[in-house]
Amino acid sequence: MKKKTLVPLLVFLMGICLVSLVVYNTDTHEKEQSRTTAQLNATTYGERIENEIINGIEITDVLKQLLISGTGEINQFDTIAKNIMSDSVESVQLAPADIVTDIYPADGNEAGKIDLIHDKERGEISIYARDHHTIVTQGPFELKQGGYGIAVRNPIYLKDENGQEYFWGFTIVILRVPDIFSDATSALSKFGYEYSLSKTDNPWSDNYKIIYQSDRQLTNPVSYDFTIGTENWKFEVTPENGWENNTLIAVISVFFIAITMLLVTLTRMWLVSKENKNKFQILAHTDSLTGIY
């Protein structure tokens, strides 16, 4: 193979190798940066969601303290519940002896007065909360009074006149879905992320079920994990356009390939020019009649 062909070919191959290396390193760096940023967002907004749920739990704790100080009774329940309600709370409830007897607001929530232990959908997890002294969350489910919500049930234990502990019942708060997540999920959508919030199906299971998610399927997401009571929650995030910065990769590829082709062209031109120069030098020193150099 002639030198003027071989050398440009070698330059081209070396250039392609260099382009591949640059593209690979850039792609790796961009993915790492994207995952770092996504993890930061998942943690930030996952903590916000966690805090919203904890705020709901704190409402049940307030009721618990009132029950303790009131020896199992809460006077003016509606007034107290009204003052501790928040925008993401659908209702506040009391369930002495496992039966929901008081709900605020009462209007539209009459169907919520049920026997938790003997309810088909709520019985098993309510019994678990009672027997294991742990807060449980359940849902989202369609509420009998309309809409969707997540129930936070806090088992309450009081002491009788002999100092013996006994199970009083539950203080309950129903959190609106998706209202409770709206601030976090709206912000992530504006930043260009898809998301999914899931939790273990129940306290004794390792299987996760989706509580709320965006429209698209998540690909290789980062996550923020937290625990409520004895249940594990997971908030996952992924960029809506994927982890790769395809625009940047395309620009870099085109730029370096163009430089490679320019070097190949210049190399070939230089070799051809050098070859022609040598030919002219030989002709200049060669006798035109005899052909002797």
Describe the predicted segments one by one:
Residues 63-66, 98, 283:
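Amphipathic, soluble alpha-helical interaction motifs
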Residues 281-293:
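Conserved nucleotide-binding and Mg2+-coordinating catalytic segments in signaling enzymes
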Residues 2-12, 16, 20-27, 214-274:
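N-terminal membrane insertion elements
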Residues 68-232:
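Intrinsically disordered, low-complexity polar/acidic regions
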Residues 11-72:
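Juxtamembrane extracytoplasmic/periplasmic/luminal helical "stalk" adjacent to the first N-terminal
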Residues 274, 278-281:
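Signal-transmission coiled-coil "S-helix" linker that connects upstream sensory/regulatory modules
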